[in-house]
A protein has these predicted regions:
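Unchanged
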Residues: 98-122, 129-186
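Acidic, metal-coordinating catalytic segment for phosphate/diphosphate chemistry
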Residues: 24-27, 31-70
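Conserved Nudix-box catalytic region and its N-terminal flanking loop in Nudix hydrolases
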Residues: 75-114
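Residue-level signal for pocket-adjacent positions within structured domains
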Residues: 62, 86-88, 93, 150, ...
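N-terminal strand-loop-strand
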Residues: 52-91, 120, 124
Length: 190
């Protein structure tokens, strides 16, 4: 049994409990649950409990699943724009978390510009993908993948990328998470 889904559910309960607690004893109980989650979550991701607790504390209000957006940008030869991630060396679509006040579509455009240097415009939604806690990191997440066209800029990798290239999907030796399937879906949707 994986412990991450349990810890994430307890984290959500504690965060929401603290948000809506209406007496000091209830607040104290939820603080204790949050401290235990931080301790055990820290062991699963090799971080001190204090750092985990600080990260959790940055989430305010009702906690929901994280929302991400990615861009599938193809050239005329059906090669896809990929970045080699600096954190694990795998290849994946440009993308990231949706910022407050931003739509997922806007996030896909922004993240592509930030990570690759290219300006893109949307051509359509490919699909919506979900990951449960522990499948790819600690948090549950929903990711929207958009087909996009490059309309300007030039390849200029950010600090998050070791490389940015148009690649034939068949030549990619190590994919990030389930990005191979996402690229196949985007190619089929062209």
């Amino acid at each position: 049994m994986r412990i991450e889904p349990l810890l994430d559910e307890l984290r959500l309960l504690a965060t929401n409990g603290l948000e809506y607690a209406d007496d000091p004893w209830e607040e104290e109980r939820w603080e204790r649950v949050a401290a235990l989650v931080s301790e055990y979550a820290g062991e699963t991701v090799d971080l001190p409990p204090e750092e985990v607790r600080e990260r959790f504390a940055q989430e305010v209000g009702h906690v929901t699943t994280k929302v991400g957006a990615e861009a599938a940008v193809f050239d005329d030869d059906d090669r896809v724009l990929l970045l080699q991630r600096a954190d694990d060396g795998t290849w994946g679509l440009p993308g990231g978390w949706v910022e407050p006040g931003e739509s997922p579509a806007e996030a896909a455009v922004r993240e592509t510009r930030e990570e690759t240097g290219l300006d893109v415009e949307l051509a359509g939604l490919v699909d919506v993908y979900d990951r449960r806690p522990g499948e790819c990191g600690f948090h549950g997440q929903v990711n929207l993948v958009y087909r996009c066209r490059a309309v300007g800029g030039g390849i200029d990798p950010s600090h998050e990328a070791l490389a940015v290239e148009y690649r034939s999907p068949a030549t990619v030796e190590a994919w990030h998470a389930d990005h191979e399937a996402r690229v196949a879906d985007a190619l089929a949707a062209r």
